[in-house]
Amino acid sequence: VAATANEPVTLQYALTSTTTNGVLIFSESGSISYTPNENFNGQDQFSYSVTAVEKSVTRNSTVTITVNSVNDLPIISLDSKLDLDKEHLIFNANPSFSVTFSDIDNTDADLTFSAIVNDESVPTIFTSTEEGKGDVSLDLSLLSKAGLFNAEIIVSDGIDSDSDSFNTWFISNKQTVTVAQDDDKSDGFDSGTTTNKDYYVYYLVGGGNTFGRTDYLFVADSLKADPNDGSTPDITSFREALLRSINALNDSDAAEFFTGYFDIVVAEPVNPDGTSLASIETGCYDWDEDVYCIGSGDINSSVFDDLFADNDLVSVLTMIDGRGVNLGNTNIQEIKPRTEYTLMHELGHAHGEMGDEYLTDDDRDVSYWADLNVNTTTETDPALLKWKHHIEDLMNVPGKDFKVCYNYADGSIFDEGEDVTTCDCLFNLYDSSGNRTGRNPDCNKVGLFEGNYYGEFDNYRPKYWTIMEGGILQYGEVNAEGFAIGSIHNQGFLYGDDVAFVSDATGSRTGFEIDIDVEYDTAKLRLKWYINGIEDSSKENQTTIVFNRPTNDSVQIYTWRVDDLTGTVTAPDDVTNNDDFYEGLFNSDFYWCDRSSGSCEWGYNPSDQSQYDYGYINGPMGGTWGINWSRW
């Protein structure tokens, strides 16, 4: 406040009555500070006097303060977030969440409640249980995609809003599928009686129009009914093992080509009764009676297509005790506290062309496969290894030029026959208290380590320890590369091509069209095209190409290749050499068709391609077509 006088005087201010709806600070100089009471709006006032000291003249005045209304935010919080994390999934299509909320400016009836899952609005119903409390029920039945998503429970007063959030697994597209279960495998799966079994089939990751094209089916096997005795139900054990496995893959060194590349579909019995839909059991093989039976006549693999016909990979998680196994695209593992280790291992076989790196006493000859995996070899020269591009120094190769050993905090060594004096590099790092702090990066490198499943001696693996030996949730650089190649293949680069000749108005063939049905991120992958081994950069990242007929009607070789920009796949790939990329593991032969007799007479990698009509190669990171234009 301020007063003026018509002559020089000293003005002294005094508060005569203070405010009633706030705190007023008033000084003798007339400066004021006012803080309204919480949630007050309206008018408040105070009175003061001002005195001209030399004249002893006093005047009084009253000041009115107007406090404008400000909308206060509503507040909401979930009463519990128990089990709302990445170790659990929401199976119920209509889950309910208890909330506590408040809003100074509005009654409960003035508030609205909503929910968002993965940025997608979902229908909600709010039920009040008492003042400031209630239940918010969600309708997740129409959720378009599944996955590990963030969810928000929201309250609004029409102007402002507040939310509480959590992150957990949401499923989608849940349906009930009825499958005929064989009653007696001894009479064959194509004869005898069957019993219909109902299974819930749902997406755990993906669904709808998603980027990933590797459809991975998980099947719950031999689950018993809940005994309701306080023990963990089998269905809970299955889901826990399932989520641990998916989380492990998402956290692994293969995550770059797992997360987003895989759609996960789950099948579990509606009424668990302890039976096995695919007739899973052990005892089929004399070399190990504990391994699960998996041959074509040993399990009823047709039920997997009945559950989900578009599966690319199948993992059966079973309550039956046994040793994990993989054959082709199907693997079986026991539901147990470390299921994720077995699953990552078996998935390496199914998806990434990985072999076993552990030593075995299985009584069978497996030497045929010693060189037919991305990660096993009988080659002893590092310069000739199929994984040499991952070796930092070919003159100082881990495993060959220096010995790596697994060490404990007390200084002892795990490796048989070794001690600290014979080891050049100790694998584990420990602090002064004996706590392991990590892996020694000098030891955990790609090299040439002797011993794997195909032989203890004269057989080699690329790293000291990976999941393909077991016990560590890491694939290693070579195996992660194999995993990435499998994912890239499934995006359509391997078998997604459609070809046709292009003709002019007279019917003469003027070109050859290759149309590739692929899905990829150009920030991570680059599609390149070649003619007779020479890249045509003008065609980069085009998925439909027409190659013009050459004027001399010669043999022309048309190739497409994927270049991995993430740095995961770095194997050298000369498109004119069928065997340089992991020794041809990921591609077919160059098949050529001679139709001069009226039907195809096939040749394999012929040196003279002019004697054939056309040829093709599948892989390794794309494909190739050869056209002998003189025959077209």
Question: Where are the language model's segments positioned?
Answer:
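Extracellular acidic, Ser/Thr/Pro-rich low-complexity tracts
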Residues: V1-E7, A52, V99-N106, V117, ...
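Surface-exposed or secretory-pathway low-complexity segments enriched in glycine-proline
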Residues: V1-T35, V63-N68, S102-S137, D164-N167
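Proline-centered linker/hinge motifs at extracellular inter-domain junctions
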Residues: G22, N71-I76, F493-L494
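A short beta-strand micro-motif common to beta-rich folds, especially ectodomain repeats
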Residues: G42-A52, G147-D157
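C-terminal edge beta-strand
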Residues: K55-V70, D162-Q175, D573-F581, F586-Y591, ...
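Propeptide-to-catalytic entry region of secreted or membrane-anchored zinc metalloproteases
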Residues: I171-D310, G322, E334, E601
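Short pre-active-site segment immediately N-terminal to the catalytic Zn-binding motif
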Residues: G324-M344
